[in-house]
């Protein structure tokens, strides 16, 4: 990421996990993601990982934290990027594509009552605000390598209650062959997105 320039396209694959989600008691959770950046001259893909955890949480809360952590990390570079954010969480994708604009128009209120995880939604909007983002949903546990890897990072973080402490050099390239030797049926790796096909979501809010 150190070579990424303003306007470059960044691909983020994020996932979340919560052990015992919805049950009574403290349910530990984690979130993780794979961040990819394509060097425009060499076509080399640079990959970084991040992961976080909470001792008592929910799936939706960790999905929001996966967004916040990813965008805070790339924003530390001081550049505004075009970002393709891929998640299997409809809560995130539909929220960012549809719900947030109406909530903000109503003063962060919704017709049906209180907004779940309101403060995290506000943090997510702030973290995202300087970037152009396309929010893309992908079916979970469907063999898409980058998404499966994000799931691996999230579930490991939840189980170990570990945190990456920022971006780490990715282990994706060594993880993929290990899965192919096991029982996981991985599909072909998603190619780095084409800038010409990038379609950012309409940003109907300000911060």
Question: What residues fall within each predicted segment?
Answer:
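RNase H-like nuclease fold core
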Residues: 1-61, 72-73, 186-207
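Stable alpha-helical structural segments in soluble proteins, enriched in small hydrophobic residues
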Residues: 62, 150-157
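Short, conserved alpha-helix that lines the donor NDP-sugar binding/gating region
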Residues: 63, 67
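Acidic, His- and aromatic-enriched active-site or binding-groove loops in soluble protein domains
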Residues: 114, 155-172
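Low-complexity, rRNA-contacting terminal tracts
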Residues: 172-185
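Conserved "HGTGT" condensation-loop signature of ketosynthase/thiolase-family condensing enzymes
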Residues: 33, 125, 170, 174-175
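Generic alpha-helical secondary-structure signal
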Residues: 69, 153, 175-178
């Amino acid at each position: 990421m150190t070579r990424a320039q303003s306007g470059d396209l960044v691909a983020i694959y994020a996932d979340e996990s919560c052990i015992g989600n919805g049950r009574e008691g403290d349910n530990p959770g984690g979130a993780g993601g794979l961040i990819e950046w394509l060097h425009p001259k060499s076509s080399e893909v640079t990959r970084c990982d991040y992961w976080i955890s909470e001792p008592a949480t929910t799936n939706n809360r960790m999905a929001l934290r996966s967004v916040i952590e990813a965008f805070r990390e790339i924003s530390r570079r001081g550049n505004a990027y075009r970002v393709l954010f891929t998640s299997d969480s409809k809560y995130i994708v539909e929220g960012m594509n549809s719900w947030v604009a109406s909530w903000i128009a109503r003063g962060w209120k919704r017709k049906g009552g209180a907004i779940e995880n309101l403060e995290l939604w506000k943090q997510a909007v702030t973290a995202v605000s300087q970037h152009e983002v396309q929010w893309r949903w992908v079916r979970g546990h469907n063999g898409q390598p980058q998404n499966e890897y994000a799931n691996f990072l999230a579930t490991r973080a939840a189980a170990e209650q570990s945190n990456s402490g920022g971006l780490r050099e990715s282990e994706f390239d060594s993880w993929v062959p290990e899965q192919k030797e096991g029982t996981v049926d991985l599909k072909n790796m998603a190619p780095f997105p084409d800038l010409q096909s990038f379609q950012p979501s309409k940003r109907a809010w300000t911060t």
